[in-house]
């Protein structure tokens, strides 16, 4: 036996609505528009058991639960919109303690088409959803704009759409004299902090130095926002300028040994490193060379220069993975031009003991000659280092 609606819904002595345990007043947005707000606009004397009337401009949000007819976590009210100015269209949303501020974009409310059984007609329903209303979201702020303090009180304001005129000729909508339905609720503190709890790890990360990108220019890396700001630093300050290469056998990013501090003797032999992939060697650090030379006495230039002699014949291989091909500069001429440009700063270095003339090289063994040219990769012509020796010896 099914109980009647009148036996389920009872009125208390104070006029409030009482529902048995388990029953809640939880209408959809379309039901709020069509079953309550539309009836109020068609008949201003319409009253509803679950929805009362209230002037939102004279009530603070924390006072509204006690004025509602029913509800535990959300409360519904009919409210008459109040214009801020007699000749304007702006709504007055201020209270004694604060104001309601609209947030986000108004949402459309549609009435779903009635389910029609079209199987007997051999077709399908072509009815579309009908736009019947709009919903605006507002948040209550304490104080006065624009320096108000945001609270967790939220209101959804439902209003009718002009499309309903087509179905209700007696409906008169006046923006300055309009009823709306307001749903007020207090948002939990945890709901607003859900996104803030998902904190991402903060750390200063440096991108892995890639062999697929040429080392040209200065690279800038942005660190994590640790102190509330963006920190930038140069890769040149934290990474060894040795240029990396990829080994086809292991596919592991590795770097050749740092040969800057090694001085190759004429009689010493050096083992040549052969790889199947194209390798890139290091060029001299001119900046360090100038600093070291400038800080030392003017009479002694050979000591700081010996640390970089091994780099003067270390040149990049042709046709590498970085796109260095035939259009690359003639580094032999570039090195000579750099020496000439720096001779006023570092004076003319004496390479006589390090790079002998061609006459002195004639009697050297093959292993000694390999020591002078060991850094030349495969496929690149051997550079005549003895020309450097002849050049400097002749100028002394």
Swiss-Prot record:
What gene is this protein a product of? NAC077
Instruction: Name the domain of life.
Output: Eukaryota
Which tissue types show expression of this protein? Expressed in phloem.
Q: What induces it?
A: Induced by salt and cold stresses.
Which Pfam family name is an example for this entry? NAM
GO terms of molecular function = sequence-specific DNA binding
> What does the UniProt entry state concerning the protein's domains?
The NAC domain includes a DNA binding domain and a dimerization domain.
PANTHER family xref list: NAC DOMAIN-CONTAINING PROTEIN 77 (PTHR31744:SF62), PROTEIN CUP-SHAPED COTYLEDON 2-RELATED (PTHR31744)
Which cysteine-cysteine pairs are annotated as disulfide bonds in the entry? none
Which keywords appear in this protein's UniProt record, sorted alphabetically? DNA-binding, Nucleus, Stress response, Transcription, Transcription regulation
**Main site of residence?**
nucleus
Protein function:
Probable transcription factor involved in stress response. Binds to DNA-specific sequences of CLPD1 and OAT promoters in vitro.
Output the Gene Ontology cellular-component terms.
Answer: nucleus
Query: Key word Glycoprotein present in the record?
Result: no
Task: Give the location in the cell.
Answer: Nucleus
Set out the biological process GO terms recorded for this chain's protein.
Answer: regulation of DNA-templated transcription
Q: What is this protein called?
A: NAC domain-containing protein 77
List where the protein spans the membrane.
Answer: none
What InterPro entries has UniProt attached to this entry?
NAC-dom (IPR003441), NAC_dom_sf (IPR036093)
NAC domain: from which residue to which, for each copy?
A: 19-187
């Amino acid at each position: 036996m099914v109980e009647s609606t009148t036996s389920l819904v009872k009125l208390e002595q104070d006029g409030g609505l009482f529902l048995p345990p388990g029953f809640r007043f939880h209408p959809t947005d379309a039901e709020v528009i069509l079953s309550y707000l539309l009836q109020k606009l068609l008949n201003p004397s319409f009253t509803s058991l679950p929805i009362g009337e209230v002037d939102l401009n004279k009530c603070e949000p924390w006072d509204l639960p006690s004025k509602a007819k029913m509800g535990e976590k959300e409360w519904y009210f009919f409210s008459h919109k109040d214009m801020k100015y007699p000749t304007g269209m702006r709504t007055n949303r201020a209270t004694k303690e604060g104001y309601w501020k609209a947030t986000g974009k108004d949402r459309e409310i549609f009435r779903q088409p009635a389910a029609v059984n079209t199987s007997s007609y051999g077709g399908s329903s072509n009815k579309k959803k009908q736009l019947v209303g709009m919903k605006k979201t507002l948040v209550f702020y304490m104080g006065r704009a624009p320096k108000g303090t945001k609270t967790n009180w939220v209101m959804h304001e439902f209003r009718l759409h002009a499309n309903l005129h087509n179905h209700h000729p007696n409906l008169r909508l006046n923006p300055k004299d309009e009823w709306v339905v307001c749903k007020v609720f207090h948002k939990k503190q945890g709901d607003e902090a859900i996104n803030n709890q998902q904190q991402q790890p903060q750390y200063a990360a440096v991108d892995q130095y890639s062999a697929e990108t040429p080392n040209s220019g200065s690279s800038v890396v942005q660190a994590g926002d640790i102190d509330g700001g963006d920190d930038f630093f140069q890769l040149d300050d934290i990474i060894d300028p040795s240029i990396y290469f990829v080994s086809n056998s292991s596919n592991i990013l590795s770097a050749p040994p740092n040969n800057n501090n090694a001085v190759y003797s004429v009689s010493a032999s050096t083992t040549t490193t052969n790889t199947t992939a194209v390798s890139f060697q290091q060029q001299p650090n001119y900046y360090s060379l100038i600093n070291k030379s400038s800080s030392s006495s003017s009479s002694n230039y050979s000591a700081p220069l010996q640390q970089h002699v091994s780099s003067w014949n270390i040149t990049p291989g042709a046709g590498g993975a970085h796109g260095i091909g035939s259009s690359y500069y003639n580094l032999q001429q570039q090195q000579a031009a750099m020496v000439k440009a720096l001779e006023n700063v570092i004076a003319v270095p004496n390479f006589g003991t390090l790079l002998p003339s061609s006459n002195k090289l004639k009697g050297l063994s093959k292993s000694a000659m390999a020591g002078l040219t060991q850094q030349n990769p495969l496929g690149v012509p051997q550079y005549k280092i003895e020309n450097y020796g002849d050049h400097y010896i002749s100028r002394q």
